[in-house]
Amino acid sequence: MPFTEPDRLFSRITRIDIQRDIVALGYTSVLLDIDNTIFTRDTHEVPRDVGVWLGRARDAGITFCLVSNNFHEGVYQLAQRLDLPIVAKAVKPLPPAFLFARHKISAKRATTLVIGDQLITDVLGAHFLGMCAYMVRPLVEQDLKHTLLLRNVERFFIGDMQPEEGCSCEESTF
């Protein structure tokens, strides 16, 4: 897989089959983006199906650490609500935040997966450290201006790569 492409692309996080796409491949830890991956920018809610998916993944033995470039109080509140460790102000794609997140959950590179909605921050950050990266389509289309610019760059690298479809957890609001 080229450095500038996700290892796998999914339409949303709930389409990642926990057993087939994570556990069976030997991943025990996930470094997880927040904004537009598990948390909507427009409503500031974790959709119910995403909450269900996170619960099922934890039940399967997956350890999570949230990794976000965001620095607002809301990301810390979300981490507390989900009972997950967090590395905020991450400055992704730079390696230190990913290394610190791995350290926080005692994760090894080979068994750690990164999941996020942006190529430039999440995928490149993972690949800089030799970790696998799954990219998901953003939960909502509404984005900040600088994120819209990055999405245009993503289209250049990803081209017409189509998302995989896997399981589906019930949809609603968590």
Task: Kindly give the residue locations of the regions a language model identified.
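Asp-based, Mg2+/Mn2+-dependent phosphohydrolase catalytic module
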Residues: M1-L32, F39-H44, R48-F174
